Amino acid sequence: MRLRTFESFWLLKNGLLYTYPSLQNNIKTEILVIGGGITGALISDALMDAGYEVTLIDRRDIGQGSTSATTSMLQYEIDEPLKDLAKKIGEEAAALCYQEGITAIQDLKKLVKTKKLNCGFQMKESLYIAHNKTAAKELYPEFEIRKKYQLGVKWLEPDAIKKTYGIVSKGGILSDTAASVDAYKMAHELIAFNVKRGMKVFDQTEIISIQDQGKTPKVITQENHTINAQKIVFCTGFESLNLLKEKVAKLIYTYATVSEPTQTYNKNLEKILIWDTQDPYLYMRTTDDGRFLVGGEDSVYKDTILQQNIKEEKSKMLIKKLKKTLPDLDFIEDISWGGIFGTTKDGLPYIGESPEYKNCLFCLGFGGNGITPNHAVEIF
């Protein structure tokens, strides 16, 4: 499955940061992490911290799946509004999910600082705006339930939003915990950090089968080499759907475009991440090299090929919506791309064991909750 178009901004910006050999012999390891994107990087780091012997493999070069296509916006919100999630799993449980999102962002901040990762990590605020009066009326109860659970929110009226940020809206929720990052670079930096302390990494290593050997599973690669592990952790995101009989997520296309470097935008925009109530929603952020990035225009997944002409149409639509939201922004398109992502019925990730695979665990973040799986090491 091809998870992005070729022109991913983060990949073009950074290039191939670190390279690793493919597996050329049979090996044994305590924990095998499959997937070298941001989730695999975070999980393997947590396992190394806990003292495990870890081997990480990926069928591509590191970070070149959906991690290189993400907009790298870290928000505690998931795709399901808190008030709606409360109806599905209960108010207390729903609030806990949101609170864990805040904790995850704070933990990522500590991780970046402690391990001195050069990945453009910046703490920000998050502005969730209503695009019309009806949306504002529906958004205000969301603000009230977030305020009830002390999630660090304020309600901003349209005039205040326009004056401070130059954004046209009908009001919105300002949250005090969010962050932006270069997830592709962070994955590379974190994996390189752990290689220095003993983790083994093999890229361009594809699995063709997993054999159940009772207490220890055995992986067979395309080159007919074997990996014996005590536990396997799948951090392969949306590609894991091919392994599971249960349909845990629905695949979608999502699109993004980034401007040329510019210094003409309202500098207050550098302090926030922006998303709105439209369906499909629009999300916006600045980058650490002075660009403006806009994404969204999600569409139903139909096949494995992201068509170039569709990507161009979506890019035009994103820019059109952006200019309605930020009419004073001088946006000159530079790079546009698309990727395949997934959504679940409640917006929550899937973390844990599957009855289909003994001694195997799955850490699958879908939709807007990709920041949370770094806590999944607790399942051990």
Could you tell me what each predicted segment is?
Residues D49-A69:
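Glycine-rich FAD pyrophosphate-binding loop
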Residues K302, Q307-Q308, K323-F380:
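C-terminal catalytic lobe of FAD-dependent flavoproteins
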Residues T70-E100:
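Glycine-rich active-site loop/strand segments that organize a redox cofactor
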Residues S209-T287:
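Flavin-dependent oxidoreductases
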Residues K88-F193:
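Rossmann-like flavin
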Residues M1-I31:
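Extreme N-terminal leader/targeting segments of oxidoreductases
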Residues I27-L56:
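N-terminal Rossmann-like FAD-binding beta1-loop-alpha1 element of flavoenzymes
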Residues I145, S169-Q230, C235:
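Helical element adjacent to the flavin cofactor pocket in flavoenzyme catalytic cores
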